Amino acid sequence: MKNLFLLLIFCWSGILSGQITDAETQLKNATKTDTVKSWKKGALFNLGFSQVTLTNWAAGGNNSISGNGVANFHLTYKGKKCAWENNLVLGYGILKQNQESIQKTDDNIELTSTYGRKATENWFYSGLINFKSQFTDGFNYPNDSIQISTFLAPGYLLGAAGMNYKFKEFLTLFVSPITSKTTFVLDEKLSNSGAFGVTPDKIIRNEVGGYLRGNFKKEIMKNVKMTSSLGLFSNYIKNPENIDINWDLLILTKVNKFITVTINTNLIYDDDITITSDKNGDGINEVNGPRPQFKEIIGFGFSYKL
């Protein structure tokens, strides 16, 4: 009887052990599946070309060829109490007319990372980092001997802490009362001249202020998607009423699986960047001071989404 009792205990322990092992395995698999589902990644590539060839054209004109490419990568994590969004945008465009040297029409590097902990249903305690720069040298065309910008000249690094409001899946509003904005000018000639608001002979300019950023991303009609990002920064120390503005807008119209039409605009106003212009056409730049900067690119090309 004693041996039978011990045998029953041994069998029952084995059954319980098997059940616990199965439960642990199911829990691990469920946790692993939930973790994988929490991460989302993707990319969008857009490439456009245009060409103009004229032969004995009585009305006149220039032969030209141009190309423009944009790559947009995103990686997001969404948990029960936290969210982490990362976005990298790379853009570059060139233009060649007749015998003139190649000129760039677009040059952009932008990385944005936002992490948030849930406070209420729609509000998150959040931190944001944004970095901007360019790939290659920029020149004061048509004079390609005067360099006016290059990689990390300028470069912008913005760090902010605040609250992020999320409305459904297409609209977010980030508000930060504590923001640090750093401007880098790592090219010696440009920094010595005080370009992009740095003190002459200095390579870094630091600012402290308030920051507001709104993001909108939605299919506004069938096969038409709109993405917009608006950033506003106010320097608490110097001229806080002069708001720095950076507004990006992208409208993407899908013709078929691979063909798209895009409209891309960028509006910038930075109170620390001096713009010179020839007001009376005598070849001398008379006007100096901050000015609105605007860029527009309309393209027809190939698009691929991962």
Functional labels for PLM-detected ranges:
Residues 1-23:
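Bacterial Sec-dependent N-terminal signal peptides
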Residues 16-44:
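Sec-dependent signal peptide cleavage junction
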Residues 43, 47-49, 69-77, 111-117, ...:
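Residues on the lipid-exposed face of transmembrane beta-strands in outer-membrane beta-barrel proteins
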Residues 47-53, 79-81, 90-96, 131-137, ...:
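Transmembrane beta-strands of outer-membrane beta-barrel pores
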Residues 54-59, 98-102, 138-144, 185-192, ...:
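Outer-membrane beta-barrel translocator domains and adjoining extracellular loop/strand segments
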Residues 55-61, 96-101, 144-149, 197-202, ...:
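Extracellular loop and loop/strand-boundary signature of outer-membrane beta-barrel proteins
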Residues 82-84, 122-125, 170-173, 223-226, ...:
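Repeated loop/turn-to-beta-strand initiation elements of outer-membrane beta-barrel proteins
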Residues 292-306:
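Outer-membrane beta-barrel "beta-signal"
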